[in-house]
Amino acid sequence: DITVEWAKEAVKLGQENDSTSLSNIEKALGYYQHWMTYRDKYGLSHPSISLTAVAIAMLSSDFQHYSDEFNHPSLLTSKYGPFYSDEEDISAGEVNPIDNWMSEKDDIDKYIEAHPDAAAYSFESTHPLTQDEWEKDVDFWNDKPVYIGHYTSMIKPDANYVGLAGNEYEIQPMMNNADSMDEIIFNPINGIDFNSYQNLVQSYLKDVKQEDKINTLKANVDTANQNLVAAQNAVKSAQN
């Protein structure tokens, strides 16, 4: 078992800017859906949601406003203590994180322009992209002057259980928002298909919003009653 020592300070459960807020949990649903549009282009499967991975992604995202360095928590354990070791992508700023990670493909395209033979390792030479082909292409690019680790993570064929999260904290001066995608293979995975997860989130959001509406209505009725009593008292005073 891992005890994430900084979690209580970094994560502000349910607060507006936190990765655990309802609005940011809902935002992460959109990240997943956008990601799948890219995976569809490569003929790839849609990973299931891991509730464990979602929790890790929330921790990793919120870590970025707690730490004095934008980095993976698993790479800063000597300073901040243990964290989960998994496949992780992090992003910061106003840009959609999925687009940000996928944009690394530009490095491949530019390299192929100068070295046409490299097109055989473009991750697009076969469709659908297979795990064997993906691994072969990854090996080819390992010693090339490209930065594509997030891109290859996004299009990994055998990614089976994932979680996404994001917050709206200030990460660095003039830079807000941190996002994370985590893929895990260790237990407990707590897997659920995306549609079921989305339904759970949206059902909960609906209940909360309905409760907010009821509370607002009650408050309005109370205010109206108070105003009515005040008006009646004013009339009585005027009559006296």
Question: For the regions a protein language model found, what residue spans apply to each?
Answer:
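Short, well-ordered surface patches within globular domains
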Residues: 1-86, 151, 156-168
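Intrinsically disordered, low-complexity segments enriched in Ser/Pro/Gly/Ala and basic residues
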Residues: 59, 73, 77, 121-124, ...
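Non-catalytic cell-wall polysaccharide-engagement segments
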Residues: 166-213
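Long, non-membrane, amphipathic alpha-helices that form coiled-coils
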Residues: 197-240
